[in-house]
Amino acid sequence: MFRLEVIRERLKSLVFAGRGLRYLVLKEDSFKFQLLFSFMFIIAGFYFDISSIEWYAQLLVMALVLSVEGLNSSIELLADYVQPNQDKKIGKIKDVAAGAVLVSGIFACVIAFVIYIPHVMALI
């Protein structure tokens, strides 16, 4: 009995998470942009036949960037709910969240350069 209830709760959590992911994909332009880049790098990974270690690194930074972008979007939604008008403190909160996305994006670019520059140079 207890076990079944735990499973039901986990399934409900998955449904809620799915709703959140659906919202990100359908409504958040920044998330769509990051998702597009992720798909482009997946295609590039197959094209250049990157190694397993390179795949791990690439998938890890893709998950990092998409996750941080999702957190940034949730912070922005919450901030707008709490204070719908312009507010310096809310602006600072949003800036810090966006800065976290920038850090993860820069890290992803560094990893992409490390992975792909040798493959591109081999073509030249």
Regions found by a protein language model. Name each.
Residues 1-74, 82, 86, 92-94, ...:
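Hydrophobic alpha-helical transmembrane segments
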